[in-house]
């Protein structure tokens, strides 16, 4: 009985380690038609979630450099240089965490992409550990350009509005390629919580954050991956 249990546990661990490698390998080349975050919204839609979502996948070359710089400036300024995990910020989060897991993310763009594509919303340590594993695999197997492309195509900018192209068209009536510095900053600042922080109507908080984002973009200067 014990031998069979050990064999079962070994196989489960093997599956949990190998399956992410396969998934990350596939998404390196294939744009996912559905992903974990979007699926969770469909299964358990939050308040004000629309009956149909908006999304159009575009390559990174069809997304404004302003938009690329805006998310790096606001979400993860170390993105061009780290290997998927900002361990300093991560240890800070763990030290502040309670009994039920971390209350805030401190996630890199790579971790956010991993969470959005491959996993489901949760604050548990198990999910966070799996997120780190996916993120490290993505950094190992993908280019920085692919990570940023996937992130900018799956992130939710508002209820049911996924990706930079859908957000640009919905909020500004332009393509993602045409986003100005101000428009890109305005979109980027809602990403911590697009259900609480909205592109429109503009609040005083959103206006302040947009100005802050534009200053950060100016300080960084350009996107160099």
UniProtKB/Swiss-Prot annotation:
Pathway entry: Cell wall biogenesis; peptidoglycan biosynthesis
EC code(s) of this entry: 2.4.99.28
GO cellular component entries: peptidoglycan-based cell wall; plasma membrane
Domain of life: Bacteria
Enzyme class: transferase
Keyword Membrane listed: yes
Keywords of this entry: Cell inner membrane, Cell membrane, Cell shape, Cell wall biogenesis/degradation, Glycosyltransferase, Membrane, Peptidoglycan synthesis, Transferase, Transmembrane, Transmembrane helix
Keyword Isomerase: no
Gene3D superfamilies from the UniProt entry: Biosynthetic peptidoglycan transglycosylase-like
Localization of this protein: Cell inner membrane
Transmembrane segments: 7-27
Entry's family note: Belongs to the glycosyltransferase 51 family.
Protein name (database record): Biosynthetic peptidoglycan transglycosylase
Native organism: Vibrio parahaemolyticus serotype O3:K6 (strain RIMD 2210633)
Gene from which the chain derives: mtgA
